[in-house]
């Protein structure tokens, strides 16, 4: 069964669960058979992308969203790299990863995404005025030259040093660790843009869908073995997702066995 590559937030683990349920012979909800059903469009959040011919959407039309929120700024938050960060302007957000952008879209702030990674697959990222390479070698000068108002990094490994240097030159920078549970990421991204209460509401819904996905996974007759191969990890070379990757967490939650974990791969390709 083919799965749309752009199922985001908690809709992705639910999709994985349903897909593995199909592979494992368990019955899945009838809604999972809908093909290319578009998601409802809300302000700041794009509708689902039409799927290529022959693809099937097993889940993802119910991505939680809270549009029309009013950010409370300025705000001070604890960045995951240990620093206190003050945020006063979110009009031009430089986003370090699609997970951050997905939360911004869900909060109705997709139009505030000013710069995104070159390999972004989110609509807000692709529509951003700038696409930029974010990795361990990204220089502070290049980020400053974008003239953004807030840098939202998504990796302690890639963005801790960069965020520190940005703060040294007076730029606002927050890092959200990409390896933590999705509800925690939602809360922290929302807090960083002055929407802490909305983030709590959204995170609660994300957790509900995660629990739903886990329940589907528990019903599998056997645990399918799944491998996630990334074309953008390890310096752009094909990489298998290891035990510390988000993919491994989703596969396990959905009742499958991550082959990368089984093979002793520990690092994430991202």
Regions found by a protein language model. Name each.
Residues 109, 128, 168-170, 254:
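Short, structured coil segments at secondary-structure junctions
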Residues 71, 94-95, 137-138, 153, ...:
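Soluble non-cytosolic domains of exported or imported proteins
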Residues 111-117, 153, 170-176, 258-260:
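Short hydrophobic/aromatic-enriched beta-strand-loop microsegments
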Residues 2-14, 21-99, 198-227:
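Bacterial Sec-exported substrate-binding components of ABC uptake systems
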Residues 74, 87-91, 97-104, 110-111, ...:
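Extracytoplasmic/secreted envelope proteins and their assembly/folding machinery
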Residues 55-58, 64-74, 91-146, 150-155:
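A short, structured surface patch at a secondary-structure boundary
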């Amino acid at each position: 069964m083919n799965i749309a590559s752009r199922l985001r937030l908690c809709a992705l683990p639910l999709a994985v669960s349903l897909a593995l349920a199909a592979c494992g012979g368990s019955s899945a909800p009838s809604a999972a058979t809908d093909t290319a059903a578009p998601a409802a469009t809300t302000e700041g959040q794009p509708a689902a992308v039409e799927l290529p011919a022959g693809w099937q959407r097993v889940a993802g039309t119910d991505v939680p969203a809270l549009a029309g929120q009013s950010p409370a700024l300025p705000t001070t938050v604890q960045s995951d790299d240990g620093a206190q960060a003050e945020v006063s302007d979110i009009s031009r957000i430089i986003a370090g990863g699609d997970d951050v952008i997905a939360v911004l879209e869900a909060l109705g702030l997709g139009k505030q995404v000013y710069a995104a990674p070159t390999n972004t697959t989110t609509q807000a990222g692709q529509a951003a005025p700038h696409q930029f390479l974010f990795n361990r070698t990204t220089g502070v000068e290049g980020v400053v030259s974008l003239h953004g108002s807030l840098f939202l990094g998504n990796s302690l490994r890639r963005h801790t040093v960069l965020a520190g240097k940005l703060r040294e030159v007076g730029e606002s920078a927050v890092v959200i660790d990409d390896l933590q549970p999705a509800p925690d990421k939602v809360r922290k991204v929302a807090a960083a843009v002055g929407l802490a209460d909305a983030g709590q509401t959204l995170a609660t819904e994300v957790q509900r869908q995660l629990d739903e996905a886990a329940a589907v996974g528990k019903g599998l007759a056997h645990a399918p073995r799944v491998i996630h191969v990334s074309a953008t990890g390890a310096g752009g070379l094909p990489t298998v997702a290891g035990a510390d990757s988000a993919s491994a967490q989703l596969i396990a939650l959905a009742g499958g066995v991550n082959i990368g974990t089984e093979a002793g791969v520990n690092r994430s390709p991202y």
